[in-house]
């Protein structure tokens, strides 16, 4: 996926991992309580809906319906991996994020129970707007909405120092306001 931008191969690789994890852990330990589908995407990535649906369905089928969740990242102005820039101009708008994730949730909500958006790629003054949209969409599709409060600082030229607690508090308070 990282090289091609196409999620379809993720299904082929991960179906064996799901089987192995269930055989070695899920079927043996009561503490195995659900699944994290680890394909971290941001937007309307080619094949993402089909890949997440196939992986979520396989996880649920093999485990008799245990919960599944995903943790995508928001394609904000701090999504600058592989560059020397601190921010970028072509970040996703709240409206475009809502449109794209409405389509994605529509295609996966029957096999993905929860979504925990990573918050590290958006600015602090954008937290409320994005978190509100995320919660609204999750509610629309009967999914749980969590937050993935990233604890490293993207506002520094050195990548990635631990975040100051005041910044973490801003993230947690924004998540609380969103519900």
Language-model regions, residue ranges each:
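Glycan-processing catalytic domains of CAZymes
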Residues: 1-179
């Amino acid at each position: 996926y990282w090289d091609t931008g196409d999620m379809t191969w993720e299904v082929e690789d991960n179906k064996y991992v799901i089987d192995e994890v269930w055989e070695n852990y899920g079927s043996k330990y009561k503490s195995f309580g659900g699944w994290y589908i680890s394909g971290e995407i941001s937007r309307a990535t080619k094949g993402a809906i089909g890949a997440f649906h196939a992986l979520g369905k396989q996880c649920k089928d093999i485990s008799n319906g245990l919960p599944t969740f995903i943790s995508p990242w928001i394609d904000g102005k701090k999504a600058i991996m592989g560059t020397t820039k601190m921010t970028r101009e072509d970040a996703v708008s709240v409206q475009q994020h809502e449109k794209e994730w409405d389509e994605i949730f529509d295609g996966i909500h029957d096999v993905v129970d929860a979504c925990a958006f990573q918050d590290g790629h958006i600015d602090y003054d954008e937290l409320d707007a994005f978190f509100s949209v995320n919660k609204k969409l999750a509610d629309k599709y009967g999914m749980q909405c969590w937050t993935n409060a990233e604890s490293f600082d993207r506002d520094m030229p050195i990548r990635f120092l631990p975040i100051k607690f005041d910044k973490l508090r801003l993230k947690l308070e924004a998540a609380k306001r969103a519900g």
